[in-house]
Swiss-Prot record:
Belongs to the SLC43A transporter (TC 2.A.1.44) family. It comes from Saccharomyces cerevisiae (strain ATCC 204508 / S288c) (Baker's yeast). InterPro entries: MFS, MFS_trans_sf, SLC43A_AATransporter. Residues 33-64, 113-119, 172-186, 324-344, 407-421, 484-504 are cytoplasmic. It is found in: Vacuole membrane. Residues 1-11, 86-91, 141-150, 208-302, 366-385, 443-462 are vacuolar. GO terms for molecular function: transmembrane transporter activity. Pfam families: MFS_1. PANTHER family: PROTEIN FMP42 (PTHR20772:SF2). Coiled coil: none annotated. It comes from the Eukaryota. The chain crosses the membrane at residues 12-32, 65-85, 92-112, 120-140, 151-171, 187-207, 303-323, 345-365, 386-406, 422-442, 463-483. This is Protein FMP42. Keywords: Membrane, Phosphoprotein, Transmembrane, Transmembrane helix, Transport, Vacuole.
Length: 504
């Protein structure tokens, strides 16, 4: 028993380590970009008339395109990776991710030799983006390795993902301050340790099959119950039902129902009914509105496509800023030194934002109804956009950056939480995966916005940012008004439970 527990500790620890060094490293692009510029990547695209300028428009657009494509690909991959995980298990996903990291590193290591065949920087960075979901999503099943601490395990994995963008920040600091000869090729030669580590873990200590599917993990995280609506092994239920007398009464009823011969179709257990009724009230009437519907019916609903519209703009704004933070701040502050300072602050705060804010985000979700949480999300998103419109103010732009690094993990967590509560757990992987996939495809428009900023607007980010702020406000208000119109008092039956939920 002890050895099994030790093994599961080791599994979680190893997963956190490799997520920290591979899951979301592409989002550290703002820190990597100065190194690529210094190494002369794509400098051949510059017109000789540009002189000895370190960065020209064509080069900047091509570098930003690398990130735009990678951010698109990593979001698109969420849907197929979830399916592969459920079909073939976490070991296969982890090994695929490891191989992709090998290939990505190989492109950077041999870039000078491959440049005549294809674009090794674009291919390499895109492969890093594809690898991320494979090595990250395959870890979700570990949330049930310690059933009573599934939320803690998920928080550790999510924190590791959010902090992984720090890898390129560390590289930039080493490159600029101590090891100027540590070029991209040498760095990724050292980076080969990461895929080797992942592969070794997958072939030795990591589980071959999932403890649970992605949908089951979502149910455990939200309800604290397993896929059959039962208490998780080893859980007394005190966290779900604080009152001991009430808890023992419900558990007794549960045991009595368990003795009844099984039915062809599973119906909600007594505990499941109790928990979901509490969640329905706690969420302000949002929990369960589309539970039991098919994925197709859910996708046709305004609950899906109105959230999708907001998510499209939100994700685009986040990734567009990551790619263009330096050039935006140079224009707004009209001071390259201050812009560089803000860029450096952003590089440091981005990985810290997720790690620091995750516990507070959890507390907010636990103690605030869903509509209020969405209102906070919408307000924060709008505020960040407004601060990004203020010229000649280091302070306001700094506040906007601080809000953005906290908002990024907040956005992802709230959209995921909304999806599980509204659409349910049976279709969670499909519906949430589709939402992420569509957002990823739409993210390619980031490249068009960047081109317009460089050419049409002469580096002025104001028109693009203002448009995105207006769209944010419109879509936020539309979704808010729709939710308010749909939340109606639910009839309560004689047992005191909402009629939405079917008991045994």
């Amino acid at each position: 028993m002890t050895s099994t527990r030790t093994l599961r500790y080791a599994q979680v620890a190893c997963a956190c380590i490799w997520c920290l060094f591979s899951a979301g490293i592409i989002f550290g692009f703002a820190a990597l970009k100065p190194i690529l510029i210094s190494e002369g990547v794509y400098h051949e695209l510059c017109d000789p008339k540009d002189g000895d300028r370190l960065l020209c428009t064509a080069q900047d657009l091509k570098l930003n395109f690398i990130f735009a494509l990678s951010a698109t690909v990593t979001n698109i991959m969420a849907l197929p990776v979830g399916k592969i995980l459920d079909m073939y298990g976490p070991r296969v996903c982890g090994i695929i991710g490891s191989c992709l990291l090998f290939l990505a590193s190989g492109n950077f290591i041999s870039a000078k030799h491959l440049v005549s065949l294809w674009d090794p920087y674009l291919v390499g960075y895109t492969l890093l983006a594809v690898a991320g979901p494979f090595v990250f999503i395959s870890c979700f099943q570990l949330a049930n390795s310690f059933p009573q601490r599934s939320g803690t395990v998920l928080a550790l994995l999510t924190g590791s993902f959010d902090s992984s963008s720090a890898l390129f920040l560390l590289y930039r600091l080493l490159y600029q301050n101590w090891f100027p000869t540590l070029n991209v090729s040498r760095f990724f030669t050292l980076y080969l340790i990461v895929p080797v580590f992942i592969l070794a873990c997958q072939l030795t200590i990591m589980p071959h099959s999932s403890y649970k599917t992605v949908n089951h993990i979502a149910k455990i995280a939200v309800e604290g119950l397993d896929e059959n609506g039962r208490l998780i092994e080893g859980d007394t239920g005190s966290g779900i039902i604080p009152d001991e007398q009430e808890r023992q009464s419900l558990i007794a009823i549960e045991r009595e129902e368990d003795s009844i011969p099984s039915r062809p179709q599973r119906r909600k257990s007594v505990l499941e009914t109790y928990v979901e009724d509490k969640l329905q009230k706690k969420s302000g009437g949002i929990f369960g509105v589309l539970h039991g519907k098919s994925a197709y019916e859910q996708i046709k609903s305004p609950w899906f496509y109105l959230m999708l519209l907001f998510a499209l703009v939100a994700m685009l704004r986040i990734n567009y800023f990551i790619a263009t933070v330096r050039t935006q701040e140079e224009y707004l502050l009209n001071d390259p030194d201050l812009a560089l300072k803000l860029n450096s602050i952003f590089d440091m705060l981005l990985p810290l934002g997720g790690a620091v804010s995750i516990p507070f985000i959890g507390l907010l979700l636990d103690h605030t109804d869903t509509l209020s949480t969405l209102t906070i999300l919408f307000t924060t998103s709008t505020a960040i956009g407004v601060f990004g419109l203020i010229p000649n103010s280091f302070t306001w732009n700094l506040i906007g950056i601080v809000l953005l690094v906290v908002y990024r993990p907040f956005y992802y967590t709230v959209v995921s939480d909304y999806s599980s509560k509204v659409f349910g757990f049976d279709t969670f992987g499909t519906v949430y995966g589709l939402l992420s996939c569509i957002c990823g495809i739409f993210n390619m428009s980031q490249n068009l916005l960047d081109k317009w900023t460089h050419t049409t607007f002469n580096m002025n980010p104001f028109p693009i940012n203002l448009t995105l702020v207006i769209l944010t406000v419109v879509f936020s208000l539309t979704l808010t008004f729709y939710i308010r119109s749909q939340i109606l008092p639910k009839p309560v039956n004689e047992r005191g439970l909402s009629s939405n939920y079917q008991t045994i």
